[in-house]
Amino acid sequence: MAAELSMGPELPTSPLAMEYVNDFDLLKFDVKKEPLGRAERPGRPCTRLQPAGSVSSTPLSTPCSSVPSSPSFSPTEQKTHLEDLYWMASNYQQMNPEALNLTPEDAVEALIGSHPVPQPLQSFDSFRGAHHHHHHHHPHPHHAYPGAGVAHDELGPHAHPHHHHHHQASPPPSSAASPAQQLPTSHPGPGPHATASATAAGGNGSVEDRFSDDQLVSMSVRELNRHLRGFTKDEVIRLKQKRRTLKNRGYAQSCRYKRVQQKHHLENEKTQLIQQVEQLKQEVSRLARERDAYKVKCEKLANSGFREAGSTSDSPSSPEFFL
């Protein structure tokens, strides 16, 4: 084990460090394999020895060239903020760079607070929250981004002078960012049951006003049942009773309208028939008068003919001569 540690030129060789490392069983830790391109990326040399009172979330057996050590907490040591930013950006790439599609520069910009946290970084928050929940033995709880508040307060005026007044007027970034960081873990979204109950609660007072009278009458029973899902039984019964009342009222109005229309039609036919009867009566009267006139004329002709036949029976001018 000592031979393996001596092979790494970047590891410390002091007796205190060797004694501190030998206290751990290095065989039980898994070494994460990294691609060759990522291993060639320049990294921060591990020349600083962690004190005995510090707590680290990264095993010491991990190569320093591939995964930098996580920031440690020590009451007697003030670590630099650039190291915290570098650790977070490098640790982000080691976790899952393909899933987040985010560069280390974006993570640094998000820590400084020059623009809102993008959506991929919020998923990183949930991962960090789960990671810190696993390491619950840390003496002080901290946010998803270690050193974010310090970097925002101290590095902000030097890196961005034109945002100095904005940083002074704004509340502390740790307290302002805590609701947004705790949102994915402590405030989960409503489930399907909560959504259905919220829909039913929103329509409790206006279940009868939700559908108009025309919609209730024209809607089929199956479609109405589909729209009434989530409401209470009393509301459904009351709405269906209203639908039946409207249907009965509409049926009665339809029957009344048909009766009125039929009555008007019969009255019109009656008027037309009365007019035709009057016309026929007038025609009968006219024909009766003509008949009487022809009858009188016929009687006159018959009487005059008999008189002439009796007086001049031999006269060739008599009508009977031609007969």
Swiss-Prot record:
PROSITE patterns: BZIP. The keyword Iron does not apply. GO terms for molecular function: DNA-binding transcription activator activity, RNA polymerase II-specific; DNA-binding transcription factor activity, RNA polymerase II-specific; identical protein binding; protein-containing complex binding; RNA polymerase II cis-regulatory region sequence-specific DNA binding; sequence-specific DNA binding. Keywords: Activator, Disease variant, DNA-binding, Isopeptide bond, Nucleus, Proto-oncogene, Repressor, Transcription, Transcription regulation, Tumor suppressor, Ubl conjugation. The keyword Transcription regulation applies. Residues 34-78, 116-210 are annotated as: Disordered. Residues 238-301 form the bZIP domain. Residues 266-287 are annotated as: Leucine-zipper. Disulfide bonds: none annotated. Phosphorylated by GSK3 and MAPK13 on serine and threonine residues. Sumoylated. Sumoylation on Lys-32 and Lys-297 stimulates its transcriptional repression activity and promotes macrophage differentiation from myeloid progenitors. Residues 54-76, 192-201 have a biased composition (Low complexity). There is a cross-link at residues 32, 297 (Glycyl lysine isopeptide (Lys-Gly) (interchain with G-Cter in SUMO)). InterPro entries: bZIP, bZIP_Maf, bZIP_sf, Maf_TF_N, TF_DNA-bd_sf, Transcription_factor_Maf_fam. It is found in: Nucleus. Residues 129-143, 159-168 have a biased composition (Basic residues). Residues 238-263 are annotated as: Basic motif. SMART domains: BRLZ. GO terms for cellular component: chromatin; nucleus; RNA polymerase II transcription regulator complex. Ubiquitous. Residues 34-43 have a biased composition (Basic and acidic residues). It is linked to Multicentric carpotarsal osteolysis syndrome: A rare skeletal disorder, usually presenting in early childhood with a clinical picture mimicking juvenile rheumatoid arthritis. Progressive destruction of the carpal and tarsal bone usually occurs and other bones may also be involved. Chronic renal failure is a frequent component of the syndrome. Intellectual disability and minor facial anomalies have been noted in some patients. Duane retraction syndrome 3 with or without deafness: A form of Duane retraction syndrome, a congenital eye movement disorder characterized by a failure of cranial nerve VI (the abducens nerve) to develop normally, resulting in restriction or absence of abduction, adduction or both, narrowing of the palpebral fissure, and retraction of the globe on attempted adduction. Undiagnosed in children, it can lead to amblyopia, a permanent uncorrectable loss of vision. Some DURS3 patients manifest sensorineural hearing loss. Homodimer or heterodimer with other bHLH-Zip transcription factors. Binds DNA as a homodimer or a heterodimer. Forms homodimers and heterodimers with FOS, FOSB and FOSL2, but not with JUN proteins (JUN, JUNB and JUND). Interacts with PAX6; the interaction is direct. Interacts with ETS1 and LRP1. Interacts with the intracellular cytoplasmic domain of LRP1 (LRPICD); the interaction results in a moderate reduction of MAFB transcriptional potential. Acts as a transcriptional activator or repressor. Plays a pivotal role in regulating lineage-specific hematopoiesis by repressing ETS1-mediated transcription of erythroid-specific genes in myeloid cells. Required for monocytic, macrophage, osteoclast, podocyte and islet beta cell differentiation. Involved in renal tubule survival and F4/80 maturation. Activates the insulin and glucagon promoters. Together with PAX6, transactivates weakly the glucagon gene promoter through the G1 element. SUMO modification controls its transcriptional activity and ability to specify macrophage fate. Belongs to the bZIP family. Maf subfamily. The leucine-zipper domain is involved in the interaction with LRPICD. This is Transcription factor MafB. It comes from Homo sapiens (Human).
